[in-house]
Structure formats: C-alpha cells, structure tokens
Design a protein with these regions (language model features):
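Hydrophobic, aliphatic-enriched repeat segments that assemble into extended interaction scaffolds
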Residues: 4-6, 114, 216, 224
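Short hydrophobic beta-strand that contains or immediately precedes a catalytic carboxylate
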Residues: 5-7, 72, 94-95, 208
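Entry/capping segment at the start of metal-dependent catalytic domains
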Residues: 1-32
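An acidic- and aromatic-residue-enriched active-site/binding cleft used to recognize and process polar
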Residues: 9, 75-76, 213
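Extended, well-ordered alpha-helical scaffold/bundle regions in very large, multi-domain proteins
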Residues: 189-234
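Active-site-proximal helix-loop-helix substrate-binding element of RNase H-like nuclease domains
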Residues: 27-37, 41-183, 190, 195
C-alpha cells in the first residue's frame, strides 16, 4: 500500500470560523492556492497553483487510486476542498492524522500535538503561519495604498509568498512525523468508520422523512396556537 500525505492552502471570502468548512468551500471565489504532498518517504513537493502550476498527473491519479492511502491533518478539510476543486478522491481512502491523535489522547492542534509528542524543531510547524494565512487567504480591505485590491496576490509580497510555500511544505513534514509516531498505536477500524460517518453527515446531512417532518411542524403550530388561546382565556 502506498501512502500520500497532503496539505493545502486555500482562500475564500467566506469566514470559515463563522460559517464552517462547507459554506467556505462552496463560495464562488474559493480556490486552492498551494498543494503540498509527499509520496511515502520521498521529499515533500509544493505545487504553486496560484501562479499557474498544475498538480502532477501522477499525483492526481494517486488521489483517486484505491491502492494509495491519503493522509492529512484534519483530513476532512483536504478531502472536501479537493473534491470541490474537481479532484475526485473518495473519503474511504483517507486517514485523518488529527483524529488518530485524538484517539491516542493528544490535542486537535497540529502545532500542539507536534510539541506534545516531542518532535525535534525541524519537524515542528512554522510559527509564522497565522500571519501568512491572514495576508493571502483572507480578503483585504481596498485602499488607495494597495490599489483598491481585495486580495493579496503572490506578486504583491514575493518574500512572504516563498515563506508561505515553506509553511505549506513544513505542515506535511510535521503531519508525517506525527503519523510515524502514532502508527505504533493503530486506530481501530471501528473508529475509522465512525470518523467517515461523521464527515459524510456533516458534508451531506442525513436522510429524513420530509412528510413526517412537515406533519410534526403542523402539529407543533396547531398545539402552540391552542395552548396560547387557552392561556389567554384563563
């Protein structure tokens, strides 16, 4: 079985903290800026999609290949965003390193988990990430100084962009280093299935009997009105 570790950097005008992943990725201006990946023990590669680079054909094939296990930290994000961007990759082929860490008693954060596990400095997450994400991944306020632009592009701050690419690369390094430690304590298949079900329910909802729901709402409305009228009479 081959393994592919992935981290992406994205942008959208929708606030992911307020609206959640799905509204964020469904925004018309959503796009993937950077795609970092590592095949097994090979060096991490970073694809600069924002500046016209394309994901290598063999990596695109691996995304859909059932013989390749895909890994990411908070894999629900990578899985959903890649599918929204047109890269078909089934959820059952994904493994979430964050969920694995939570199963083993660690925190949800990549940075905090890396430190808790005791990763060496060169394997830990870069601290500059939050500022870079605010600069490139969140709309900016148009001003005369910035030419009334609403997005900061790579060419507006080339040094920052190169650091952002390094941040993207390092996230894969950190995720893979954490995974190597966690693999000593495999996540049970039942836990994996539960994670998949949770992701799918959040992405697509659950089937319900709509007629039953309509009936329940009607009964609620009628009973509320009757009880209100009774309270007024009393």
């Amino acid at each position: 079985m081959k393994h592919l570790s992935i981290d992406i950097e994205t942008r959208s005008s929708v606030d992911i903290g307020k609206a959640g992943l799905y509204k964020y990725a469904q925004s018309p201006d959503f796009c993937i800026l950077l795609f970092a990946f590592q095949e097994d023990g090979n060096p991490v590669e970073v694809v600069d999609l924002a500046q016209g680079e394309e994901i290598p054909e063999h990596a695109v094939r691996m995304l859909a290949d059932p013989d390749v296990t895909k890994h990411a930290y908070n894999a629900a994000f990578e899985w959903y965003c890649l599918n929204r961007a047109g890269y078909r990759t089934p959820l059952e082929q994904w493994r979430c390193t964050m969920a694995h860490g939570l199963y083993c008693g660690y925190t949800a954060g990549l940075d905090a988990t890396g430190k808790a596990i005791g990763l060496p400095q060169d394997k830990q997450k870069l601290a500059a990430g939050k500022a870079l994400i605010r600069y490139f991944c969140v709309p900016c306020r148009p001003t005369k100084t910035n030419g009334n632009r609403t997005w900061n592009q790579p060419w507006h701050a080339k040094e920052k962009w190169e650091l952002f690419k390094e941040y993207n690369r390092q996230d894969v390094v950190t995720e893979r280093a954490i995974l190597n430690r966690l693999e000593q304590f495999p996540m049970p298949e039942a836990e994996q299935k539960q994670w998949q079900m949770d992701v799918l329910m959040n992405a697509f909802g659950v089937r319900v009997d709509t007629e039953l729901i309509k009936g329940a709402l009607y009964i609620d409305a009628v009973s509320t009105q009757e009880l209100t009228e009774e309270a007024v009479r009393i």
